[in-house]
A protein has these predicted regions:
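N-terminal leader segment of winged-helix/HTH proteins
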Residues: 1-29, 76, 99
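N-terminal helix-turn-helix DNA-binding core of bacterial DNA-binding proteins
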Residues: 20-60, 82, 86-93
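Short, solvent-exposed amphipathic helices
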Residues: 21, 97, 101, 105-108
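A cross-family signal for key residues in well-ordered alpha-helices
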Residues: 39, 72, 99
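Alpha-helical residues within the helix-turn-helix
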Residues: 55, 72-73
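Short, hydrophobic-biased segments on the C-terminal half of alpha helices
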Residues: 68-69
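Residue cluster at the C-terminal edge of the helix-turn-helix DNA-binding motif
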Residues: 73-80
């Protein structure tokens, strides 16, 4: 999109209502540990336990659990109890677009 497209009316800016709705989600996702968790869950393609996520994130249970709670509170993740385990999965697939941008920036 360029300024000429906006001036000609062929494209429009994202509404403030939409931006206000998604800003808290972006703010909460934009944390290195949370991004790492999302990257791991995306690559696994199926729900994973806290212990699996701890191992992949190379972090302790308290830190991982705190980050999972934040993502769950924003409806980015779902949590489902199976026996003694709680399995986490990505609920809002649109956040994966942010990961794609990061992966693109990682390339030399």
């Amino acid at each position: 999109m360029n300024t000429q497209d906006l001036k000609s009316g062929s494209m429009s800016l994202i509404s403030m209502e939409t931006l206000e709705r998604v800003a808290p989600i972006i703010r909460n996702v934009a944390h290195p540990m949370r991004l790492r968790i999302l990257d791991y869950l995306d690559q696994q393609g199926e729900p994973r336990s806290v212990s699996d996520i701890m191992e992949a994130a190379e972090a302790g249970q308290a830190i991982v659990s705190q980050q999972l709670r934040i993502l769950k509170d924003q409806d980015v993740l779902t949590a489902k109890r199976e026996g003694n385990f709680v399995l986490y999965a990505i609920a809002d697939r649109s956040v994966l677009l942010l990961l794609d941008c990061i992966r693109h920036r990682q390339q030399p």
